């Protein structure tokens, strides 16, 4: 069986140094992110959008095993612990944007 290749946690890397990696996620309505694993704790700040979903992979472990849908709250910041293999899906009618700060 071929080894699975995972993508990035967001669509564009903005900055990386010895302490953080800062990413931008930008998804058009109906678009999906790369399937990715969160190997670091991170802070997620929603910027724009109306509905977002996370679809876990079958081998995702811990608290990250259920499909979730959520309303987007622009300006809302959340601290999230590492773990999970997922794909983000913009299930809304508006463009979805977020900033994701991985903590090293």
Where are these regions (language model features)?
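N-terminal low-complexity, Pro/Thr/Ser-rich intrinsically disordered segments
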Residues: 1-4
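A short glycine-rich, His/Asp/Glu-containing loop-to-beta-strand
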Residues: 7-34, 39-44, 98
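Short acidic-glycine-tyrosine-enriched beta hairpin
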Residues: 16, 58-82
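Short beta-strand segments in beta-sandwich/barrel cores
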Residues: 23, 32-33, 50-55, 77
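Surface loops and adjacent helix of pleckstrin homology
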Residues: 25, 38, 57, 91, ...
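Glycine- and acidic-residue-biased ligand/ion/polar-headgroup-sensing regions
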Residues: 39-61
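Ligand-binding loop in jelly-roll beta-barrel domains
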Residues: 73, 81-104
């Amino acid at each position: 069986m071929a080894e699975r290749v995972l993508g990035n946690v967001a669509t564009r890397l903005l900055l990386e140094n010895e302490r953080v990696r800062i990413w931008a996620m930008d998804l058009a309505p109906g678009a999906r992110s790369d399937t990715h694993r969160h190997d670091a704790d991170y802070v997620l700040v929603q910027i724009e959008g109306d509905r977002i979903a996370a679809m876990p992979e079958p081998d995702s472990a811990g608290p990250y095993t259920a499909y979730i849908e959520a309303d987007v709250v622009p300006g809302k910041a959340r601290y999230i612990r590492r773990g999970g293999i997922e794909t983000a899906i913009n299930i809304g009618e508006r463009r979805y944007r977020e900033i994701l700060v991985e903590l090293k």
